[in-house]
Every structure is written in structure tokens, then in C-alpha cells.
Amino acid sequence: MNDKHKNFGFSTRAIHYGYNALENNGALIPPVYMTSTFAFPTVEYGAGCFAGEESGHFYTRISNPTLALLESRMAALENGEAGVAFSSGMGAIAATFWTLLRPGDEIIVNRTLYGCTFALLHHGIGEFGVVVKHVDMSNLAELEAAIGPATRMIYFETPANPNMQLVDIAAVSAIAHTHNDLIVVIDNTYCTPYLQRPLELGADVVVHSATKYLSGHSDITAGVVVTRQSLADRIRLQGLKDLTGAVLSPHDAHLLMRGIKTLALRMDRHCSSAQVIAQMLQDHPAVEWVAYPGLPSFPQYALASRQMKLPGGMIAFELKGGMAAGQRFMNALQLFSRAVSLGGAESLAQHPASMTHSTYTLEERAKHGISEGLVRLAVGLEDIADLLADIEQAMKAMA
């Protein structure tokens, strides 16, 4: 880490880490290096770059000064050694899988996963000889029993998308590290490093869809991996350079760093509004249950209090009346937008059974915790009174 900034607080690092305006012609905002390639002063220097003996940049698919600043800043926020930036969260996840897994290896994943990650596992690496095992990671005995000689990776989200199930990061990491060469990879998109830092709890690799809260404005797609230097080097040179080519543009890296500067402020607002909405939903007669880590009624409330700074801006709840109720509620919303994704200023709502998981059979949805009346809210930054009023009028229209 940069000695000048490493001991500052979270928001100070998010704004300043790794950059000195006086070393950049006084430019307060880091310059954007919009170039695909870089000139070498000598042939010998170029040879050193290709051999990894020189630290200079030579092609943006591998490195770029704008991306390098973003990567170092994200590593500082996650308290990791190094970061690698990608053009999407799925690019980050795919590069991590393709780099660290080989045919014949096993990966153990939580039963509930983001739909595109599920597809990558079963229609991507699963078709190239990697064995995928699904377990309920809230059951540590089930997890431990699933680990075998070929297991190379444990992967999960916490909270899980979309049902908000938590996984005990420290406990899973402790189990994993009793086995040699077993890597724990965590998708930290829902929390960001402001709310949760998995590397500090024993995880080996953190992945993000930086499209979401890190960016915060729903105007780019991006992904980031943070891990130790040796793994980051492999993921960059194999997963990014050779296997996926999922390169983040310098302009989008600039926008992402701009969003990260206000991350703490935004997350505080997302969390405070979500807490109020979750309580309102819990008290509503049309709601069967609410899954929100900030509610004392949440089954994993104690775990949330241990490993998360705040409970986050995502809420899952079940409407009485199943599929029909869920669709009526969704169609009646006026301020919440019916859309996938999360983490922007705008509040979003989605009905997984009708939207993201509509291609699953009823049995498949039940297996993965996707019930018919499940609604997921991504609480934005609007005035809380307006959000509450929109939910209330949609409930009345649904009835």
C-alpha cells in the first residue's frame, strides 16, 4: 500500500489512495489514459516489459495507468494485496474460475447463487470437466462432508442473491484452510468493502460486480477481483489477458473511481432507508416474511451483526398470494423501477419468478430458494417517505 494513504480512514482512502496531484501536473482528478498501446523508449525496455522484469505499461488489455490506480484503490479498500479490473462482474468471476480451476477439479458453491453465475458454472466450466457441487453453506457439517480430494475452490455470495441468506465467512474459511490448496472466493457485491471485508475474515479472493454499489450510478458495467499478489498476477495474465479479454475501458475506470469516492455516504443512506422499509414490510398484513439482515427477526441476525458493518440496501420479502400477488404488486409500483441490477441512486424492484428465474421450473426455483411470491427490492437514494408511499399504494392496488 502507498505509505501516504494506508493509515487513513475508509472514505479518505476511497478519495485519495494512490494518487498525488503534484506528480500529475497539478491535476486534482487523475488523468484518463485513453490509449490502447504504449511506446517503449528502447527495444530492451520493451523486452523487459514482456518478460515481467519492467513495471511499465505496454498494452491496455494487460495494464493501463488509469486501471492500475483503480485496482490499487480497490485493494486498499478491501485490505488486499492487489486488484484486477474487468469490464463486468461476470468477467471477473469467469476469469477467476478459468484461471484457478482445471478439468477434474471440484468447486463447492452455495445453493443460492446469482443466475448468471449459476449458468457459468453449469454451461461454462462444468462442460469443461470441472465438477460443481451445490450445498447449503449455512450448514457447516454439510459443507465439510462435501469437501473431497479434488475440491479446489469454495464459492459463495453473502448475502446471497436474491433471498439474502448469509454465509459465515470466518467459519467457512477456517474449514477450507484445513485442506491444502483450497481457495475461498466470495462475491462481495451486495456489501462492498464498506460493509464487509471478507479477506479480513479469512477468504482468499473477493470478486465484485462494480456495476452496482461501487459505481453507484447505473451507467457502466465493471468488475473487480482483489486477492494476494500471486493470485492477482495469475488472474491478470491468464484470466484477463488470455482467457476472457474482459478489459475495462479507461473511461469506465474513471467513472468507477468517481463513484467510489462517495461510496460510504451512499451506503449509509441505502442502509438507513432499507431498515425503515424492511420494518414497514414486516408489519404489513400482505407480507408473509421479510429477509433483511437488520431486522432482529432475521434468522441470521447475530451473524450479520458480526461480519457486516451495516445490514445493506437489499431486501427480500414474500407476498401472500404467490405468483399472482407478486406480479400485481410489481406492476402497480410507480416510483420503484421494474428492473434487474442494484446499487444505483434509483430504487429498483424485481420479481425473480417472473424475471431473472422465469426459465427455471417450479421445482428448480424451490430448490434454489426462489418462491413464487418473492420480491427483491434494491433501495435507492430517494426520500424515504416517497418510497414508503409507493410501496403502500402498490400493496393496496395488489389487493
UniProtKB/Swiss-Prot annotation:
Binding residue positions for substrate: 114, 376
Organism name: Pseudomonas deceptionensis
Protein name, entry field: L-methionine gamma-lyase
Keyword vocabulary terms for this entry: Lyase, Pyridoxal phosphate
Function comment: Catalyzes the alpha,gamma-elimination of L-methionine to produce methanethiol, 2-oxobutanoate and ammonia.
Deleted gene: phenotype: Mutant cannot make methanethiol (MeSH) or dimethylsulfide (DMS) from either minimal medium or medium supplemented with methionine. However, it can make DMS when exogenous MeSH is added.
Keyword Iron-sulfur tagged: no
Gene Ontology MF annotations: methionine gamma-lyase activity; pyridoxal phosphate binding
Subunit note: Homotetramer; dimer of active dimers.
Phylogenetic lineage: Bacteria, Pseudomonadati, Pseudomonadota, Gammaproteobacteria, Pseudomonadales
